Amino acid sequence: MIGKLTGILAERNPPQVVVDCNGVGYEVDVPMSTFYNLPGTGERVSLLTHFVVREDAQILYGFGTAEERAAFRQLIKISGVGPRTALGLLSGMSVGELSQAITTQELGRLVKIPGIGKKTAERLLLELKGKLGADIGLPAHAATDAQADILQALVALGYSDKEAALALKALPKDATVSEGIKLALKALAK
């Protein structure tokens, strides 16, 4: 219903902010990763949102990137993971780190997040395996757009997320897309 808010950042009270849009202040719950990247109070801000309507509340969740919002939406589809738990996960680790933890099946990394027990972490690993990075278009280890393109190309060529991520780690950080794909294919052929 409300997909994006653009306005003036009126208040900052972690994990909630108030965005003033033409005189109307919207309370928005944000993950700490988004909170720390927000401008100062009184400055212009734009947040992608997810609107949750419950019997007792209507809550806006805000995100700095489309990847964060997509990951949030994937997380809340899982039984036992509500919006608060999903927000906690995204506050405890970046989307890339979460994608990497899912890809490499790192149970220990997930249970370190407050509110995530062993059973919930196991459910996350099971239900998100092969989905999180692919659905949101986010490579697990990509730091640049070129690295993201390289990883997506390798996955499109049939390599698993894990194989592609390992090949990407071995590449120089400044490799162009075409150079990176060639080098990664050579490394994967060995």
Curated annotation (Swiss-Prot):
Key word DNA damage present: yes
Main location per the UniProt record: cytoplasm
Region (Domain III): 142-190
Cellular component annotations (GO), alphabetically ordered: cytoplasm; Holliday junction helicase complex; Holliday junction resolvase complex
Region annotated Flexible linker, chain positions: 137-141
Record region (Domain I): 1-64
Protein's name in the database: Holliday junction branch migration complex subunit RuvA
